[in-house]
Curated annotation (Swiss-Prot):
Organismal lineage: Eukaryota, Metazoa, Chordata, Craniata, Vertebrata
Protease is among the record's keywords: yes
Annotated keywords: Disulfide bond, Hydrolase, Protease, Serine protease, Signal, Zymogen
The protein's name: Mast cell protease 1
Organism, scientific name: Meriones unguiculatus (Mongolian jird)
Gene Ontology biological process terms, A to Z: proteolysis
Length: 246
């Protein structure tokens, strides 16, 4: 995860996003059982991919810019190029993007995917905890992001899950992003490090002490940190309403 997240809209069809892991390492197989790989068919008929994470046996969280005509979720995967016995492939029944999501500003870049059936919880497939609405991660904290995205600006996407350590930055570090909003977004990745999420990682989680605090959203086209992640805590009340079917 070295590269910065870039607005997928600029590189992929607008229905799908993709950021990658640059400067990271291969994850221990199945050590992140909440990770989801999304195969997306766009409205134009192209195929794209995003990351996501299981927050409930029937709901996966991802970025709103990963929306497509159809999405299939693969859970329990390490190497997405192989048919692993741990994998569960489930089609998405409903894509629920946040009602205030803006394609132009990329604010409220969060979406819930309701699966056609509940995932079977196993050693390789499990949910991850979310923060409380008042839980704000502070600058200086080191968290991790994971995904199957590119391992470099000119490199292909990775078949195997990779992860990277990223530092939470102050809002001043993201001042050059015109629409950055500290209340709803997290500034992630030290400019002094060649580490980030990049194309293919969009929608994946930012995990701090075992809790999903952010969602890979966007960054610079040259993958230079910091990048912008959606902050999850302000959306917890909305998330709970969606899961309850309200």
């Amino acid at each position: 995860m070295q590269a910065l997240l870039f607005l997928l809209a600029l590189l992929w069809p607008p229905e799908a996003g993709a950021e990658e892991i640059i400067g990271g390492v291969e994850s221990k197989p199945h050590s992140r059982p909440y990770m989801a790989h999304l195969t997306i068919t766009t409205k134009q008929g192209f195929t794209a991919s995003c990351g996501g994470f299981l927050i409930n046996p029937q709901f996966v969280m991802t970025a709103a810019h990963c929306k497509g005509r159809e999405i299939t979720v693969t859970l329990g995967a390490h190497d997405v190029s192989k048919k692993e016995s741990t994998q569960q492939k489930i089609k998405v029944a409903k894509q629920i993007a946040h009602p205030s999501y803006s394609f132009y500003s990329n604010l409220h870049d969060i979406m819930l995917l309701k699966l056609q059936k509940k995932a079977k919880v196993t050693a390789s497939v499990d949910v991850i905890s979310l923060p409380s609405p008042s839980d704000f991660i502070n600058p200086g904290k080191v968290c991790r992001a994971a995904g199957w995205g590119r391992t470099g600006v000119t490199e292909p996407t990775s078949d195997k899950l990779r992860e990277v350590k990223l530092r939470i930055m102050t809002k001043a570090a993201c001042k050059n992003y015109e629409h950055y909003d500290y209340n709803f977004q997290v500034c992630v990745g030290s400019p002094s490090k060649i580490r980030s999420a990049y194309k293919g990682d969009s929608g994946g989680p930012l995990v701090c002490a075992g809790v999903a605090h952010g969602i890979v959203s966007y960054g610079r086209i040259d993958a230079k940190p910091p990048a912008v992640f959606t902050r999850i805590s302000p959306y917890v009340p909305w998330i709970n309403l969606v899961i309850r079917g309200k």
